[in-house]
């Protein structure tokens, strides 16, 4: 077939083939965007903006395949503003509510919600979800949700979506599924245009066809079209070869004519009138014969002289022609390079570029058609998964020329950014990282914390024996935490590990703590090296450690902590106002405000609105007698006139927004306009203002308070009160001393020493009954500590208190070593029995001999003390033995339970005890005629959660009443 005819036939066939394709192209081909975070093909978020705001766009599909554990929640897909984090579009699964929620920004700047109810999406099974949004650029849009290939719900007449997208594509941020343990996202794609049937087939779903026939026949036509295109390609190949042959023939004829010497046009003489005779033309002039010395051949071509002239050999490799004229061969036409690799035609020869990314192989270079046909470039796929392309312990999927990183392997948790770490869970023994001697605790954010059990110490993953129960092991452990170091006082609890002379022996058990050669009992500076023992003021402290060297001050009190004792400091509180002029000498108050004009500043006035210059406070409740009404309707220890919730129990008096209404009775604790509980709440950050309620991971906790719920700059993991910004760590450094028998001189008052930043208290004297009470008040609380009597010379009472409201109202847990009758029989004979006792103190007389004898006595005393529980073993404490106590108090229901451990063994348990005498209060320690008591490793924690055994106790109580 001549070349022109072949070309015309080819183009005619192409036109005929494309005609049906053009007719069916009205059914647009789906455009698919892979949104998986791990996809190597994942698009830039800014690429979505021009697509979604295209005015011709009428169909958008979101397809996903995932598995969520029971009651899990997750944002599957969302578009947000990268500048202010506002939502443009978001699709969220709410597992606990069996709902899915679609949120998108309308034209008026408000968020529109579409709620799909009764969807079982978080049940630990794999689900396929298809979300179809139609007619988005009009005001009558619709949304259809398909679950596991079946339509589950649809909503009509919706406002426009995507119309609120910013005009700046760079300000759009794309967020997808945030994986949690046991959850995974297998597929996430955004599809624009196309038919529902086409998109559903991407999930291997074959829905009932309700599309027009033209749309449903697209698949058959595609197969027909592919066949026709294959035939067309074959025909075009034949035409190409034919054209190449025609070019060669034409070139040969051109060269032959150019070199032909005998060729020339015939000519005729003019005939005579009688004849017509052809006459040969005159002979042309003789041309000179050419030889090889004139270099007639193409460079590099061998030339041979012959009788008739010269003869040229064949063209060099890489060229084609007659030897005289040679043209470069395009070897790239024979496809020597790997598909997708650029072929560079050289003169002569060719070169293949390097293999594509994800492949490996040589860079091929050669000359000639034969070489190009027989030396094809070979590129082999690189298995990136063997080269650590994905993070360790994650799923890696090798693909041709690339790879894809999937979720963490089973048993691991994390992502490709944070890495995959061993999955931890307290519920699964195989995933529990804790020591067999530790308790596994799951925190609010799903983290796992390990805490060594009673009688053991360490970091929780490794635990060793701890005889004195001060949280330091008897021997050093193979871990790096502070609590892995060897206890420097193995048999004496010292949770601060103080060691003044750094000799490796703790001060608590070092007979010469400062290493000056003078035993502690004779040393006037026990913790300061002073061989000379100089003591200028003749008090009990030598000059080397005396904060007032020339003024006698045995209490060594130093209010402002400046190193100068109050006795010799002319500005005790360090507020810049001299004591003689300061209306609060021991409380900083530069403003010197004094509302009632009694010369006592408001900052330290026990009645700031009632004149009471003597500051008398008989019942030690921090409210002066002049304004103390003792009218307390809710029994939480705060009289009605000062209680910020007079009829609601709230001993802590927490008022987060400082509006004068306590959180317990405030509907909006943070005053951000979102109610704590009722719609449009509940507030996902109840204590931190966040009117927009941003919650990126949809876990029910707002972004602003995710890891620090009360925003007190102490993360929840170590915060003892995560929902109270006023309490962060256990600290008894500030305390109130309460003497319970202030009359008489038979004994002396207790001497309290606070160590380890307020987490350890020591009482050194054989004293009258007394309390050291912290200033922090609690509603529900867990209180624990280590109790140790470090002497063998006495056998009296030691313990702790809770629910302290005043010196006549508190709970006390007290332990007597032996049975003993109190030596003062007035006002009545009091007998103490050995063992642990839980008492409710509600004294009508207050501190004095009646309360003193009532505390000593084991049993109830009228108008003074009630015995709530006594350890039936009647076993006293042992000398120099450590015990650990755990108290749970929930004043809102009257729940009390206390347990004691000796080593790791539970030795006493009060069980559930119900009493509502005191509805919350402060914590502290108690002593009565017992010296050298140590309360070590003290810990308290806010906790209003009602323990499970309370419900069991109530059920049993009702059953007994019924019987």
Swiss-Prot record:
Cross-referenced PROSITE patterns: EGF_2 (PS01186), EGF_3 (PS50026), EGF_CA (PS01187), TSP3 (PS51234), TSP_CTER (PS51236)
UniProt subcellular location: Endoplasmic reticulum; Sarcoplasmic reticulum; Secreted; Secreted, Extracellular space
Gene3D superfamilies given in the database record: 1.20.5.10, 2.60.120.200, Laminin, TSP type-3 repeat
Signal peptide residues on this chain, from the entry's feature table: 1-26
Composition-biased stretches (Polar residues): 642-654
Keyword vocabulary terms for this entry: Calcium, Cell adhesion, Disulfide bond, EGF-like domain, Endoplasmic reticulum, Extracellular matrix, Glycoprotein, Growth factor, Mitogen, Repeat, Sarcoplasmic reticulum, Secreted, Signal, Tissue remodeling, Unfolded protein response
Positions with biased composition (Acidic residues): 662-673
Occurrences of domain EGF-like (ranges): 288-327, 328-365, 381-418, 422-464
Disulfide feature: 292-303, 297-312, 315-326, 332-343, 337-352, 355-379, 385-396, 390-405, 408-420, 426-440, 434-450, 452-463, 479-484, 489-509, 525-545, 548-568, 584-604, 607-627, 645-665, 685-705, 721-942
Motif position, Cell attachment site: 138-140, 564-566
Major localization listed first in the record, in broad terms: endoplasmic reticulum
A GO BP entry: positive regulation of endothelial cell proliferation
Superkingdom: Eukaryota
Family per record: Belongs to the thrombospondin family.
Subunit structure as annotated in this protein's UniProt entry: Homopentamer; disulfide-linked. Interacts with PTBP3. Interacts (via EGF-like 3; calcium-binding domain) with ATF6 and facilitates its processing, activation and nuclear translocation. Interacts with NOTCH1.
Protein name: Thrombospondin-4
Gene source species: Mus musculus (Mouse)
Gene that produces this protein: Thbs4
């Amino acid at each position: 077939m001549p070349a022109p005819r072949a070309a015309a036939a080819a183009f005619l066939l192409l036109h005929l083939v494309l005609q049906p394709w053009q007719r069916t192209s009205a059914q647009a081909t789906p455009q698919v965007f892979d949104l998986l975070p791990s996809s190597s093909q994942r698009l830039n978020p800014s690429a979505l903006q021009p697509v979604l705001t295209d005015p011709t766009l009428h169909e958008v599909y979101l397809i996903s395949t995932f598995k969520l554990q029971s009651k899990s929640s997750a944002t599957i897909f969302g578009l947000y503003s990268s500048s202010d984090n506002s939502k443009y579009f978001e699709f969220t699964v709410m597992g606990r509510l069996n709902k899915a929620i679609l949120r998108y920004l309308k034209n008026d700047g408000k968020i529109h919600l579409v709620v799909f109810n009764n969807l079982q999406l978080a049940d630990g099974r794999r689900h396929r979800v298809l979300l179809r949004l139609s007619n988005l650029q009009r005001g009558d849009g619709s949304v259809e949700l398909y679950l596991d290939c079946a339509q589950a719900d649809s909503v009509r007449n919706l406002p426009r979506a995507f119309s609120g997208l910013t005009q700046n594509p760079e300000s759009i941020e794309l967020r997808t599924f945030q994986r949690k343990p046991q959850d995974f996202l297998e597929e996430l794609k955004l599809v624009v245009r196309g038919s529902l049937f086409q998109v559903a087939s991407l999930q291997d779903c074959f829905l009932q066809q309700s599309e027009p026939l033209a749309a449903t026949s697209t698949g058959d036509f595609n197969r027909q079209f592919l066949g026709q295109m294959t035939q067309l390609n074959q025909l075009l190949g034949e035409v190409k070869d034919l054209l190449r042959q025609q070019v060669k023939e034409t070139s040969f004829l051109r060269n032959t004519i150019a070199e032909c010497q005998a060729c020339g046009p015939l000519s005729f003489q003019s005939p005579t009138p009688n004849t017509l005779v052809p006459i040969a033309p005159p002979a042309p002039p003789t041309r000179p014969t050419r030889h090889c010395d004139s270099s007639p051949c193409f460079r590099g071509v061998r030339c041979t002289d012959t009788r008739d002239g010269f003869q040229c050999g064949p063209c060099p490799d890489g060229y084609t022609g007659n030897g005289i004229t040679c043209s470069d061969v395009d070897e790239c036409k024979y496809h020597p390079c790997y598909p997708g690799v650029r072929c560079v035609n050289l003169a002569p020869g060719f070169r293949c570029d390097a293999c594509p990314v994800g492949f490996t192989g040589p860079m091929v270079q050669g000359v000639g058609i034969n070489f190009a046909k027989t030396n094809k470039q070979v590129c082999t796929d690189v298995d990136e998964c063997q080269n650590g392309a994905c993070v360790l312990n994650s799923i890696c999927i090798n693909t041709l020329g690339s790879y894809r990183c999937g979720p963490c392997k089973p048993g691991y948790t994390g992502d490709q950014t944070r890495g995959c770490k061993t999955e931890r869970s307290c519920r699964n023994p195989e995933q529990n990282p804790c020591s067999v001697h530790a308790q596994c605790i799951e925190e609010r954010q799903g983290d796992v914390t390990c805490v060594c059990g009673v009688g053991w110490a360490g970091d929780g993953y490794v635990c060793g024996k701890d005889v004195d129960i001060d949280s330091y092991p008897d021997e050093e452990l193979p871990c790096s935490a502070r609590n892995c170091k060897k206890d420097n006082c193995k048999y004496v609890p010292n949770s601060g590990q103080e060691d003044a002379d750094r000799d490796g022996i703790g001060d608590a058990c070092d007979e010469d703590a400062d290493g000056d050669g003078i035993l502690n009992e004779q040393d006037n500076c026990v913790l300061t090296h002073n061989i000379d023992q100089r003591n200028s003021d003749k008090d009990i402290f030598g000059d080397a450690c005396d904060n007032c060297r020339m003024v006698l001050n045995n209490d060594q009190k130093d209010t402002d902590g400046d190193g100068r004792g109050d006795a010799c400091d002319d500005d005790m509180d360090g507020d810049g106002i001299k004591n003689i002029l300061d209306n609060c000498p021991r409380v900083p108050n530069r403003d010197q405000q004094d509302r009632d004009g009694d010369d006592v500043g408001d900052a330290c006035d026990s009645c700031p609105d009632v004149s009471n210059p003597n500051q008398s406070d008989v019942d030690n409740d921090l409210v002066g007698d002049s304004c103390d009404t003792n009218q307390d309707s809710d029994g939480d220890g705060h009289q009605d006139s000062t209680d910020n919730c007079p009829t609601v129990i709230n001993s802590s008096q927490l008022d987060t927004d400082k509006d004068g209404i306590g959180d317990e009775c405030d509907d909006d604790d943070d005053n951000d306009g979102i109610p704590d509980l009722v719609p449009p709440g509940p507030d996902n950050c109840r204590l931190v203002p966040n009117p927009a309620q941003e919650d990126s991971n949809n876990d029910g906790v707002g972004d602003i308070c995710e890891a620090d719920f009360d925003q007190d700059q102490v993360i929840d993991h170590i915060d003892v009160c995560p929902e109270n910004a006023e309490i962060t760590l256990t600290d008894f450094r500030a305390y109130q001393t309460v003497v319970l028998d202030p009359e008489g001189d038979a004994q002396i008052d207790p001497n309290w020493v606070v160590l380890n930043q307020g987490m350890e208290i020591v009482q050194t004297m054989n004293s009258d009954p007394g309390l050291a009470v912290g200033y922090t008040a609690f509603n529900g609380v867990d209180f624990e500590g280590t109790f140790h009597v470090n002497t063998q010379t006495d056998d009296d009472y030691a313990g702790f208190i809770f629910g302290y409201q005043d010196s006549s109202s508190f709970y006390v847990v007290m332990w007597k070593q032996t049975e003993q009758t109190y030596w003062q029989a007035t006002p009545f004979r009091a007998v103490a029995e050995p063992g642990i006792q839980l008492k409710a103190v509600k004294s009508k007389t207050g501190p004095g001999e009646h309360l003193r004898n009532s505390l000593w006595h084991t049993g109830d005393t009228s108008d003074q003390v009630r015995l709530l529980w006594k350890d039936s073993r009647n076993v006293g404490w042992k000398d120099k033995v450590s015990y650990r106590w755990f108290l749970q108090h929930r004043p809102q229901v009257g729940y009390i339970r206390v347990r004691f451990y000796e080593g790791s063994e539970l030795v006493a348990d009060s069980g559930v005890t119900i009493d509502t005498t005191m509805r919350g209060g402060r914590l502290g320690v108690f002593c009565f005629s017992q010296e050298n008591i140590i309360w070590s490793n003290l810990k308290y924690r806010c906790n209003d959660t009602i323990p499970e055994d309370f419900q069991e106790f109530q059920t049993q109580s009702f059953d007994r009443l019924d019987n």
